Amino acid sequence: MQKYDIAIIGGGVLGTTISYWLSTLYDLKICLIEKEHDVALHSSTRNSGVIHYPFYIDPKKKKNFARAAFLSHDMWKVLANENNIPWVQGGTIEIALDEEQHKTLEKYMVLGKENGLTEEDISILDSNELKQKEPNLNCHSGLYCTKEGSTNYGLLTKAVSELSKKNGTNFLLKHNVKYVEETSDQANIIFSDNSSLTANFVINCAGGNSLDVAKKFRLLKDYSDLHFRGEYWVADSNIANLVKTNIYTVPRYPEFPFLDPHWIKRANGETEIGPNAVPVDSPEAYDSFITDIPTVLSKITDIVTGSTKKLLLNTDFISLVSKEFLSSISKSAMVE
């Protein structure tokens, strides 16, 4: 049986980069466990590809998150350039439609500067200034961030995995965690093929499956999760070049972890509108709303007995979910 100092479960961008940093900083025996045949086959590839800079993150509430977003920007850029991975820094404009939303942009300016951004990185433009930059954009005002743009995080994750392998990390692909046996000082991880390994320390980076993995360690038993699929519409060629930058709007539902659909200039040259947030029964329900009947029944049971049941009584949440569901079958609903 293989023995490791650290086992990381999940081969997405988070698990892969953690494996790289740990293998760079420490002389440890490390493995990364991934159930798929390669890294970054799920959320790390299936995303907008937008390069985010922390002008909207409150450093008092999310200090480490804001700091990581600020410091990692140039690291990702260097890695992209070294590996010929697309990195298009065309900028992002977050627009306000009225004076009330403009106040949110002013708040973002303060947060951005607290996070280390300069006046060259972010600025607020009025409607006339925006017209000069983007003639087809009609709004009250906008916050322009020059450091944002688009890349391919799936390719970046694979590049990081190669660096981690050179440091000695063992990538265990096609290894699906079946169950876990714990002792006082280590975890015995058993896989679907009944092979196993032991680790002194385990890091859970399983993305949409993180709660399922945690429960295999008999943690968070009373918690449940909800899964949402983000969908994008590819803009037709006759409208794809209406604007040159990513366009976001001030979120209408800041109390929920959803963004309104936005205008995305992809690193591959395509223009897309999205994403929405369509409720599905599992984190990998990419082509349908329902994976299978047992999965649906299990998810319903989790929701009505677990921590997410209170959302079912929130009328704002139910209204938002209904609109998101409609946007999955209607382009006009997505645009609206």
Question: What is the predicted role of each segment?
Answer:
Residues 23-45:
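Glycine-rich FAD pyrophosphate-binding loop
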Residues 271, 276-336:
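Contiguous C-terminal substrate-recognition/catalytic subdomains in enzyme active sites
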Residues 19, 23-24, 163:
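Gly/Ala-rich phosphate-binding loop of Rossmann-like dinucleotide-binding domains
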Residues 60, 64-70, 95-105, 143-163, ...:
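Short beta-strand to alpha-helix junction loop
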Residues 2-14, 31:
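Beta1/beta-strand and adjacent pyrophosphate-binding region of the FAD-binding site
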Residues 49-128, 133, 260-261, 270, ...:
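Dinucleotide-binding Rossmann-like beta1-alpha1 core, especially the glycine-rich loop
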Residues 143-201:
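Helical element adjacent to the flavin cofactor pocket in flavoenzyme catalytic cores
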Residues 17, 180-294:
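Flavin-dependent oxidoreductases
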